[in-house]
Amino acid sequence: RGLNPDNPVIRGTAQNPDIYFQTREAVNNYYDALPEIVEEYMGKISKMTGREYHLFNYYGAEDAEDIIIVMGSGADTVRTVVEKLNAEGKKVGVLVVHLYRPFSIKHFMNAIPASVKRIAVLDRTKEPGAFGEPLYLDVRAAFYASDRNPMIIGGRYGLGSKDLVPADVVAVFDNLA
């Protein structure tokens, strides 16, 4: 049960305040490198499976004016509605987030068609007292430094395992118009 060199164990590690800040900041370069590394491996997975994955996958009209940004379980429902609405002649799309943290503004902005005028960001969380939910705030921040200025609204879905149904997605697009 005691410590010995043949069976090393570590528990309850701590860093003293005199170096904690520096060690937390020292990892920034590793986090900054992650989007490119993940994108590279997603490319390898795509070659093996035939399914194309990126940090952000866009589906919909190339000249969409209205898009929904979503991640997680609601993405398939939104994509199904986007396909139906596009078949009816509407110009809509969905941006599916696959790597949320670290948030790559470069990859994010490159994935959104230049024609987009209105964006609904759907989060599957509620942040009481906050200006908005996490994904919504990151999307707003990404456009802040851009010369593009679409209208961006936030919304939420799926709290308490409530299903996101196609009628909900249609209502989001109707609200954007």
Where does each model-flagged region fall?
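Conformationally flexible catalytic loops at phosphate/diphosphate-handling active centers
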Residues: 1-58
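A general structural motif
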Residues: 34-53, 70-78, 98-105
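Generic secondary-structure signature for well-ordered alpha-helical cores
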Residues: 36, 43-51, 83, 87-90, ...
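Flexible, glycine/charged-enriched surface loops at secondary-structure junctions
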Residues: 48-59, 92-93, 149-154, 177
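Redox- and metal-dependent alpha/beta enzyme cores, enriched for Fe-S-associated oxidoreductases
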Residues: 62-90, 103-110
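Short glycine/threonine-rich loop-to-helix capping motif typified by GTGT followed
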Residues: 72, 83, 103-114, 133, ...
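Core nucleotide-handling region used for phosphoryl-transfer chemistry
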Residues: 88-118, 122
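Peripheral docking tails and interdomain loops at the edges
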Residues: 118, 122-177
